[in-house]
């Protein structure tokens, strides 16, 4: 209802500024508005025994923000990871978030995002292998990463959710593998890791000419289109500000509530921080805790929009 009501007005505001939205964004909204509606097509399912018929509306199958399709994909992803991908070993979640300027850069440059993920993966993998006491030439670890682009307030916040095996495999001379489990990272180790990650990421961006540092400050060197509406929208979203309309530039009003069970379970204070980089590693599952692991997989693969968290006040505010 909210999208259907305000999407045309939003497009009109953008066009009046002589700005444009990328085609994939417009398509995401338009197909979402057709999702689950019988008038846009359906399948007729009929039971062979009782002859009961049921109509199933076509879905948009988009990956942006459709709550229905996103929830279905969340369940499928979690089942796949637990049943077919993640081994029956201890698993730890590592969550890395970035400074505001880098969130903007990563949101607009998938090639850079891929390179940064590779840097982060190597830093954590090397740490696990060394801590396991195994030679690098004989050791392997593993991880699955889900990149989330949203925060709890639907703000733009590119960050990594990485599920690492909590240890390393050692390949013996006979070809067999032996697993070496490691202890949870200490506060000192987290600070060391996040410092290494920040230095290597910044160094890579400088070599690519995307980040310029002088004696006083650092800034991004980006070639941006002035008529691209997404640039302005992303800049405001990252800093929790209203992007268009009469209240443009104002901070979004937010309420701090009692943490949900997800926040309580998956948001501990085991964290290392430096210069806007933040590395969490306080959540882990034991070998036999497959149900907890599935809950964790559902949590990190959840869609951006949760209809349970949306409500309209009597004044019409969201």
Where are these regions (language model features)?
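Beta->alpha loop/short-helix hinge microenvironment recognizer with preference
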Residues: 1-318
């Amino acid at each position: 209802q909210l999208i259907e009501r305000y999407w045309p007005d939003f497009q009109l505001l953008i066009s009046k500024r002589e700005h444009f939205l990328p085609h994939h964004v417009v398509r995401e909204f338009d197909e979402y508005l057709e999702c689950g509606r019988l008038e846009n097509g359906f399948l007729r399912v009929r039971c062979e025994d009782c002859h009961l018929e049921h109509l199933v509306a076509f879905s948009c199958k988009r990956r942006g923000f459709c709550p229905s399709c996103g929830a279905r994909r969340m369940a499928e992803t979690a089942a796949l990871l637990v049943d077919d991908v993640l081994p029956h070993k201890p698993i730890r979640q590592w969550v890395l978030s970035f400074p505001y300027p880098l969130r903007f850069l990563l949101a607009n440059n998938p090639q850079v995002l891929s390179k940064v993920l590779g840097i982060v993966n190597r830093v954590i993998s090397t740490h696990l292998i060394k801590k396991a006491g195994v030679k690098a030439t004989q050791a392997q670890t593993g991880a699955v990463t889900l990149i989330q682009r949203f925060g709890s307030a639907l703000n733009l916040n590119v960050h990594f959710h990485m599920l690492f095996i909590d240890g390393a495999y050692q390949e013996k001379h006979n070809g067999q593998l032996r697993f070496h489990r490691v202890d949870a990272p200490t506060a000192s180790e987290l600070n060391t890791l996040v410092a290494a990650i920040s230095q290597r990421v910044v160094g890579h961006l400088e070599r690519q000419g995307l980040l310029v540092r002088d004696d006083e400050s650092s800034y991004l060197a980006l070639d941006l289109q002035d008529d691209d509406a997404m640039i302005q929208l992303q800049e405001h979203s990252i800093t929790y500000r209203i992007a268009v309309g009469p209240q443009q530039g104002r901070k979004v009003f937010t309420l701090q509530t009692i943490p949900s069970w997800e926040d309580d379970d998956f948001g501990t204070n085991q964290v290392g921080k430096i210069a806007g980089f933040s590395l969490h590693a306080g959540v882990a599952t034991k070998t036999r805790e497959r149900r907890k692991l599935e809950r964790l997989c559902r949590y990190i693969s959840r869609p951006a929009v949760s209809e349970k968290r949306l409500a309209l006040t009597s004044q019409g505010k969201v």
